[in-house]
């Protein structure tokens, strides 16, 4: 029989491994590069890209939920860019990555792999609307 582990059995977690400090609303938004940002609640992440035509959001975890919208509004206001979310890209179909996708309704175009679409149709979850645009191997969004 084994005994349960105690706090003395593990090395302390280094402060740098804890991630960035969250604001009073429970999220942190950081710049990856130029107009690409990430948002975290300390567990899950999302990302968004600001453009002159609007914002492209990558994943919408329910644990971040409305804070994702707040982060988009905060950054676009500071950068003088439009805050309209025009596209939402699903990384995959799991609810822990797309469960707040319903918050971005209206004219948003949802993009996902064709298998993501199939699985979202199967699941029938209204919080995760099915992507209108799908791809098999790759998809390019925007002008080239």
Regions found by a protein language model. Give the residues of each.
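Intrinsically disordered, low-complexity regions enriched in small/polar residues
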Residues: 12, 29-30, 39-40, 50, ...
């Amino acid at each position: 029989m084994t005994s349960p582990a105690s706090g003395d059995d593990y090395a302390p977690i280094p402060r740098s491994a804890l991630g960035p400090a969250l604001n009073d609303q429970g999220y942190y938004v950081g710049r990856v590069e130029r107009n690409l940002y990430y948002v975290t609640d300390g567990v899950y992440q999302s990302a968004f890209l600001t453009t002159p035509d609007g914002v492209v959001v990558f994943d919408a975890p329910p644990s971040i939920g409305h804070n994702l919208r707040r982060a988009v509004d905060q950054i676009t206001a500071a950068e003088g860019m439009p805050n309209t979310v025009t596209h939402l890209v699903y990384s995959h179909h799991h609810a822990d990555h797309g469960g707040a996708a319903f918050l971005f309704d209206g004219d948003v175009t949802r993009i996902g792999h064709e298998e993501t679409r199939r699985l979202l149709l199967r699941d029938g979850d209204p919080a995760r609307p099915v992507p209108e645009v799908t791809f098999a191997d790759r998809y390019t969004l925007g002008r080239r």
